[in-house]
């Protein structure tokens, strides 16, 4: 019996450690643990509490905004402050835009490659893949032409020997169950998701000053100038622009993300029972 420790686990949000006991190549027991302490807690000691949100959002480069707002709310609660309604609206818009970005990135760009075999795309029939995708939703990005373009792109990467973001995967592993066509759909949507997560992040940056790590929050509200007649501030034109960006992202989530999650999950029903934990 040997013990293997993997720390840290990559392609996740946060910190994760896995310990496993292996006997003749078979995992007998496994433990998952997360490191809660990051060290920023020590940095904050003795500092002005109004600065805390600037530091705490550095916990993560993906889920940054929620740490900033949780921190500033903690200070506001301690001071018994109520923020203006417009400030709450702006914070809410930042949070929802960030949540949309975060879910898209987490599924497609962090988690999906544990379930999707990129190299199997080379065996896929683009026409069949398009037919399967169109049976799930009426998304315009599911055409045969789109699937052919993605297959050719992956073929070029494989033939070059430089897989880029798809390097070092467990390609060909028997635990991967998706058909070649579903793999092609997933990779196609992986690439499309790069654009849609960016649209959501644009909204965060437009309101927060930049992303990652927004700059507009303050204890007691936000630091956004609002003037409907000035192009240099938050005005109606900017709000309309953000609305259009969010509508694009919502369309992708409803017609691509949700069907993809359900489709991939359907190939791995046994995983719903894993990870129950030990006592």
What are these regions (language model features)?
Residues 1-279:
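Active-site bordering "gate/hinge" segments
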């Amino acid at each position: 019996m040997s013990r293997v420790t993997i720390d840290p686990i990559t392609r996740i949000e946060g910190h994760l450690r896995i310990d496993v006991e292996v006997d003749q190549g078979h995992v007998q027991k496994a433990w998952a643990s997360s490191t809660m302490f990051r060290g920023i807690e020590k940095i904050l000691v003795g500092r002005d509490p109004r600065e805390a949100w600037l530091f705490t959002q550095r916990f993560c480069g993906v889920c940054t905004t929620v740490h900033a707002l949780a921190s500033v709310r903690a200070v506001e609660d301690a001071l018994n402050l109520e923020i203006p309604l417009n400030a709450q609206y702006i914070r809410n818009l930042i949070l929802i835009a960030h949540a949309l970005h975060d879910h898209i990135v987490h599924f497609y760009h962090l988690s999906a490659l544990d379930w999707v075999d990129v190299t199997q795309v080379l065996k896929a029939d683009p026409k069949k893949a398009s037919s399967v995708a169109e049976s799930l939703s009426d998304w315009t990005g599911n055409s045969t032409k789109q699937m052919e373009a993605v297959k050719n792109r992956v073929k070029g990467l494989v033939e070059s020997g430089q897989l880029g973001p798809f390097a070092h995967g467990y390609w060909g592993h028997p635990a991967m169950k998706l058909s070649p066509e579903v793999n092609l759909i997933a990779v196609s949507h992986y690439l499309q998701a790069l654009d849609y997560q960016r649209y959501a992040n644009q909204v965060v940056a437009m309101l927060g000053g930049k992303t990652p790590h927004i700059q507009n929050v303050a204890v007691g509200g936000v630091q956004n100038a609002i003037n409907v007649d000035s192009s240099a501030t938050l005005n109606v034109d900017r709000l309309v622009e953000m609305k259009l960006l969010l509508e694009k992202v919502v369309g992708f989530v409803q017609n691509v993300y949700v069907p993809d999650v359900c489709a991939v999950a359907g190939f791995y029903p046994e995983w719903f029972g894993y990870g129950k934990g030990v006592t």
